[in-house]
């Protein structure tokens, strides 16, 4: 039993390796980009809109309200990044219903990359909103003695994001694989359904935490 797709090497030339995690990640990205292009190719501003566009607008509206409730008033500025995070993680986790599929989020390399994107995005959004000086001032609030603690907090929460998502998805896959070998068929099916729900919850938690971190970084201007 493989712990993650990192152990399955598809192609190797010297030190360059193409493992299942990388291949699956690129395949998911291609599917998502193609699906997005297909879904948005005939958007209409008129009164007569296709039903699928109404559904998309409802979903986007819900996402915007969720972002605004966290504290980011200009939700459309952050929706492309935060929405992409959620969709990629959710789609990656939902595809576990495909036999033989190894979710990229079950690999620490993938979750670390996602967490690093949040680590980079937070100061970028903070600087864009408050300016370089305004953003850097948040590290010495409420007192300059908090500077090292705030830096440690930035690093530790990035690590926590990566490990939390990796641990939950990998453990779920391992438990399901074990149950398939030692229990009747019905129980693993129920666990698969629970795994899909857990995958959606993890995608929601990851994106909400990213939203909270960005909201905190953009708060300097308001203060």
Swiss-Prot record:
Keyword Cell inner membrane: yes
Keywords, ordered alphabetically: ATP synthesis, Cell inner membrane, Cell membrane, CF(0), Hydrogen ion transport, Ion transport, Membrane, Transmembrane, Transmembrane helix, Transport
Source organism superkingdom: Bacteria
Ranges that cross the membrane: 20-40, 78-98, 108-128, 174-194, 196-216
One record GO biological process: proton motive force-driven plasma membrane ATP synthesis
Cell compartment(s), UniProt: Cell inner membrane
Topological type in the membrane: Multi-pass membrane protein
CDD domains: ATP-synt_Fo_a_6
InterPro entries assigned to the protein according to its UniProt record, in alphabetical order: Alt_ATP_synth_F0_Asu, ATP_syn_F0_a_bact/chloroplast, ATP_synth_F0_asu, ATP_synth_F0_asu_AS, F0_ATP_A_sf
GO function term, MF aspect, one: proton-transporting ATP synthase activity, rotational mechanism
One GO location term (cellular component): proton-transporting ATP synthase complex
HAMAP family named in the record: ATP_synth_a_bact
Family under the similarity heading: Belongs to the ATPase A chain family.
Subunit structure: F-type ATPases have 2 components, CF(1) - the catalytic core - and CF(0) - the membrane proton channel. CF(1) has five subunits: alpha(3), beta(3), gamma(1), delta(1), epsilon(1). CF(0) has four main subunits: a, b, b' and c.
Function, in words: Key component of the proton channel; it plays a direct role in the translocation of protons across the membrane.
Protein name (database record): ATP synthase subunit a 1
Organism of origin: Chlorobium luteolum (strain DSM 273 / BCRC 81028 / 2530) (Pelodictyon luteolum)
Protein's gene: atpB1
């Amino acid at each position: 039993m493989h712990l993650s797709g990192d152990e399955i090497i598809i192609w190797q030339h010297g030190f360059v390796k193409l493992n299942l995690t990388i291949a699956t990640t690129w395949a998911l990205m291609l599917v998502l980009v193609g699906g997005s292009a297909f879904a948005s190719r005939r958007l209409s501003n008129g009164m007569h809109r296709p039903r699928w566009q109404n559904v998309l607008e409802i979903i986007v509206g819900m996402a915007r309200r969720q972002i605004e409730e966290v504290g980011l008033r200009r939700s459309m500025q952050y929706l492309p990044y935060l929405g992409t995070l959620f969709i990629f993680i959710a789609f990656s986790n939902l595809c576990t219903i495909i036999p033989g599929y190894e979710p990229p989020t079950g690999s620490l390399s993938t979750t670390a990359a996602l967490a690093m994107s949040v680590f980079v995005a937070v100061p970028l959004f903070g600087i864009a909103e408050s300016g370089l000086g305004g953003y850097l001032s948040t590290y010495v609030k409420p007192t300059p003695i908090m500077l090292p603690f705030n830096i440690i907090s930035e690093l530790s929460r990035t690590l926590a994001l990566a490990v939390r998502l990796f641990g939950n998805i990998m453990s779920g896959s391992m438990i399901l694989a074990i149950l398939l070998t030692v229990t009747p068929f019905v129980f693993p099916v129920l666990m698969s359904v629970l795994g899909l729900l857990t995958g959606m919850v993890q995608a929601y938690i990851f994106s909400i935490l990213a939203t909270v971190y960005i909201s905190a970084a953009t708060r300097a201007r308001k203060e």
